[in-house]
Curated annotation (Swiss-Prot):
The gene is argB. Catalyzes the ATP-dependent phosphorylation of N-acetyl-L-glutamate. It comes from Bifidobacterium adolescentis (strain ATCC 15703 / DSM 20083 / NCTC 11814 / E194a). Its main location: cytoplasm. This is Acetylglutamate kinase. The lineage of its organism: Bacteria, Bacillati, Actinomycetota, Actinomycetes, Bifidobacteriales. It is an enzyme of class 2 (transferase).
Length: 318
């Protein structure tokens, strides 16, 4: 866990520069949230810079172990866009995009499957298991966890074939339930069999897959890691960061969101529609952002809830 903060002319060590009473205050602030979420399931979508930077990867693994050890049940769902692009380039396979979406040919799908299940998943499982035998990797193919339907998005006004890309349409969470009941931390790769042809595997959006799994598990929260502070009402005005937004308010905003943020916010909507009480978008570039969200009173990032209304984060001083 990070022990020091450094910058030009600045150095802070949490061991030596916090008084004993200040350390106690931090722990006491977490108490009501430890009580509220004890025994609860929380689905975390792992992505962005948090899965590229070595320090952030280690911090994320520590967060998952912390959650498990204080009585929560974390479930991780991950993609791996940067790693897939890197491997395709190394193999001399051209990456093609249409409307910002990767075209996944059968050749590219083999690479997607290999990278997600054989590289990204194994690395994260290893980082978590450095702290004890907690994590188990599986994909959306295992135990028929996910079933997906091939997607033809509308690009420039017409349905467009982008290859072996799909959306999760059903979830059988029994394999994940078994792991949770055994005290494990499931780490799920976002590939899934095609509902129309079980021999064919589709590359599915990890945000959407995490939302579907959160709903199927009856999770208390969906937390999506991003490379921004949260959802802004008027980007690039940084004072317009939203702290809390109702799902219907968010639904109205979706058509105007940038392409990178839209699938993440759509995942939050899907989770709330599926009965998940809270969905969060937080900045995964900040070490231990998961713990800051769950165990502090104000939290961080943007929280989506069933109730109407919008609150700016500036209104409660964080």
């Amino acid at each position: 866990m990070a022990k020091e903060l450094k910058g030009p002319g600045f150095h802070f060590d949490v061991h030596t520069d916090l008084r004993a009473d200040q350390k106690a205050e931090v722990l006491i602030e977490a108490l009501p949230w430890l009580e509220e979420f004890a025994g609860q399931r929380i689905v975390i979508k792992y992505g962005g810079n948090a899965m590229i930077d070595d320090h952030l990867k280690a911090c994320f693994a520590e967060d998952m172990v912390f959650l498990r050890q204080v009585g929560l049940h974390p479930v991780v769902v991950h993609g791996g866009g940067p790693q897939i692009s890197q491997m395709l380039k190394a193999l001399g396979i051209k990456s093609e995009f249409k409307g910002g979406l990767r075209v996944t040919t059968p050749e590219a799908m083999d690479v997607v499957r290999m990278v997600l299940t054989g590289k990204v998943s194994r690395e994260l499982v290893g980082l978590i298991n450095a702290h004890g035998p907690f994590a188990v990797g599986l994909s959306g193919e295992d135990g028929a966890l996910f079933s997906a339907m091939q997607r033809k998005p509308v690009i420039d006004g017409k349905p467009t074939d982008i290859g072996l890309v799909g959306d999760v349409v059903s979830v059988d969470a029994s394999a994940v339930e078994d792991l949770i009941n055994a005290g494990r931390i499931p780490v799920v790769s976002s590939v899934a069999p095609n509902e129309d042809d079980a021999t064919e595997v589709l590359n599915v959006n990890a945000d959407s897959a995490a939302a579907a799994l959160a709903a199927a598990l009856g999770a208390s929260k969906l937390v999506v890691l991003t490379d921004v502070d949260g959802l802004y009402a008027d980007w690039p005005d940084r004072d317009s960061l939203i702290g809390r937004i109702g799902v219907e308010n968010l639904r109205d905003m979706l058509p105007d969101l940038e392409s990178g943020m839209r699938p993440k916010m759509e995942a939050c909507v899907r989770a709330i529609d599926g009965g998940v009480p809270r969905a969060h978008i937080i900045d995964g570039r900040k070490p231990h952002s998961i713990l800051n969200e769950i165990f502090t009173t104000d939290g961080i990032g943007t929280m989506v809830v069933p109730e109407d209304g919008i609150e700016m984060r500036s209104s409660y001083g964080n």
